Regions:
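Conserved cytosolic headpiece of P-type ATPases
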Residues: 1-229
Length: 229
């Protein structure tokens, strides 16, 4: 019974937190910054496109964004920086590899004017395993193993600020992939950057945890996020 409990395990998102994501920080152009101070060059534009297109949420006629809280936060982030919702219409999805909790990745293929781009988002470690290059201030560089430590350091900094971090990558292809080619879609990617999102705690969560502590009950939080988050 509850009265004889010694340990209580709780999931985090939506139970201890409000499940209302907001993008707070961005790692792009070799640095982490608040979104208001981010350097908005071509690298940043690619990150925004990845946020908007590798995304299953929808912008409704009344301006509201419907979908998963993480994905709606990514679209809201782009719209607040004046990137138009028309980007989602003008770059239609022609193929996809849906998000899978085991892979911790999602990929889409979007086309425009006969050109196709694979956009991928997911956990940092999973993204880095699929990449062989990275964007660095407008150029694609291939010494990813040397640069990966700097990426992980910035990921750790954001996680230590209680931010949930998603990483983004892309590659250009010259045709719509066949069913066979879809198996290797998430390979040879170029790392773009990361975003850090805050999911505010519920006001009552802190008091509930304190009551458990005073009662001698150990509390355990269950989450798929980075340990530091």
């Amino acid at each position: 019974t509850l009265g004889s409990s010694t340990v209580i395990c709780s999931d985090k998102t939506g139970t201890l937190t409000q499940n209302k994501m907001t993008v707070e920080k961005v790692f792009c152009n070799d640095t982490t910054s608040d979104i208001e101070r981010a350097e908005t060059n071509e690298d940043f534009r690619k990150l925004i496109y990845d946020c908007m297109l590798c995304n299953d949420s929808r912008v409704l006629e009344n301006g509201e964004i419907a979908g998963d809280p993480t994905e709606t936060a990514l679209v809201d982030f782009a719209l607040k920086l004046d990137y138009p919702v028309s980007i989602m219409r003008e770059n239609p999805r022609v193929a996809e590899v849906p998000f899978d909790s085991n892979r911790k990745l999602m990929s889409t293929v979007n086309g425009k004017d006969g050109k196709y781009i694979v956009y991928t988002k997911g956990g940092l470690d999973e993204i880095l395993r699929k990449c062989d290059s990275y964007l660095y201030k407008g150029s694609v560089r291939h010494n990813l193993s040397d640069y990966a430590e700097w990426i992980r350091t910035n990921n750790e900094h954001m996680a230590n600020e209680a931010l949930r971090v998603l990483a983004f990558a892309y590659k250009e292809i010259d045709h719509v992939p066949s069913k066979y080619e879809m198996e290797n879609l998430e390979s040879g990617l170029t790392f773009i950057g990361m975003v850090g999102m805050i999911d505010p705690p519920r006001e009552e969560a802190k008091k509930a945890v304190e009551k458990c502590k005073h009662a001698g009950i150990k509390t355990v939080m269950i989450t798929g996020d980075h340990k530091a988050t």
